[in-house]
Design a protein with these regions (language model features):
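Short coil-to-helix N-cap segments within the nucleotide-binding domains
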Residues: 10-11, 26
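H-loop/switch region of ABC-family ATPase nucleotide-binding domains
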Residues: 37-38
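Helical segment within the ABC ATPase nucleotide-binding domain
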Residues: 16-29
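Catalytic Walker B motif of ABC-type/P-loop ATPase nucleotide-binding domains
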Residues: 2-6
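A short, surface-exposed alpha-helical micro-motif characterized by mixed small hydrophobic
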Residues: 43-45
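Short, glycine/charged-rich "phosphate-handling" switch motifs in NTP-dependent
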Residues: 49, 61
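Short acidic-hydrophobic catalytic motif
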Residues: 65-69
Length: 80
């Protein structure tokens, strides 16, 4: 299990992309990754499962792809 808390915080976009590539490589080895991340689009794009928390409670869950495609998520969290 690898726990990552905001690995993109404060980094330039080029470094963020590299960090997420590394996270994907770690996933491919079979390591479970628990990622807490404010960059929702990046996090959801590599997630098998995703949870949206509001004030400490799970308000939405699904696959990363399901949440990326969700109108509710687009409007509330992804600026869509």
């Amino acid at each position: 299990l690898l726990l990552l808390d905001e690995p993109s915080m404060g980094l330039a976009p080029i470094f963020i992309r590299e960090i997420f590539k590394i996270i994907q490589e770690i996933q491919k080895t079979g390591t479970t990754v628990l990622l807490i991340e404010q960059n929702a689009k990046m996090a959801l794009s590599i997630s098998n499962r995703a949870y949206v928390l509001e004030t400490g409670s799970v308000v939405l869950s699904g696959t990363g792809q399901e949440l990326l495609e969700s109108d509710e998520i687009q409007k509330a969290y992804l600026g869509g």
